């Protein structure tokens, strides 16, 4: 995070090269800057993938242009990466179908599309408007309760898959990639883990 590193100092931050050499999972959460000192467009290009040391899993939930599609395809084909999970794509909604077919999970740009995420975004927008107009508003934004708020599972991973199984969204997109915009626009409301109670499976 170069902008934060410039403001806060180097402590607690790592270079992209260090991450490329040491990480088994690399996940991108950066804004898209197309030029300048903080350029992130095609941050993951051929040179980046060639620098990887541990064949990591690549995850992108930021912006599609952060990863150069051709470079990722080559990295998958040559074993520079173990696998990829992609939620954001270059040239949406006309996404690269070869990449969609190769990735472990591919979803239609739905990061932040949970009911909680939409509620938080609405709350932030209202707060900004209130500050701008110097008014106080009394409001509550309460997402709908999940249909099954009580989760029984042996492990946390099993519990989380009951809350949300990304394979369903991935299968839907891989089956009908031409419906990218519809799958995104008609995305059903789902709650995040704070809305659930997890209990151990009875012995």
Predicted regions and their residues:
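Rossmann-like adenosine-cofactor binding region
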Residues: 4-97
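Short beta-strand "acidic-cap" motif of Rossmann-like dinucleotide-binding folds
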Residues: 1
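Rossmann-like dinucleotide-binding domain for NAD(H)/NADP(H)
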Residues: 55, 61-203
């Amino acid at each position: 995070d170069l902008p934060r590193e410039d403001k806060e100092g180097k402590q607690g931050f790592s270079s992209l090269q260090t991450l490329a050499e040491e990480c088994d999972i690399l996940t991108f959460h950066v804004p898209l800057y197309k030029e300048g000192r903080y350029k992130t467009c095609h941050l993951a290009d051929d040179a980046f993938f060639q620098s990887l040391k541990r064949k990591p899993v690549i995850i992108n939930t930021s912006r599609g242009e952060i990863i150069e599609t051709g470079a990722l395809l080559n990295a998958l084909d040559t074993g520079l990466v173990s696998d990829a999970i992609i939620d954001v794509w270059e040239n949406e909604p006309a996404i690269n179908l070869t990449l969609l077919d190769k990735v472990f999970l591919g979803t239609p740009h739905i990061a932040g599309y949970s009911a909680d995420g939409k509620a938080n975004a609405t709350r932030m927008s209202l707060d900004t408007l209130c500050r701008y107009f110097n008014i106080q508003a009394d409001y509550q934004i309460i997402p709908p309760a999940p249909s099954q708020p009580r989760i029984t599972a042996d492990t946390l991973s099993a519990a989380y898959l009951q809350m949300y199984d990304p394979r369903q969204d991935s299968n839907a997109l891989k089956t009908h990639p031409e419906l990218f915009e519809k799958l995104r626009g008609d995305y059903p409301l789902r709650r995040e883990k704070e809305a659930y109670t997890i209990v151990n499976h009875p012995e």
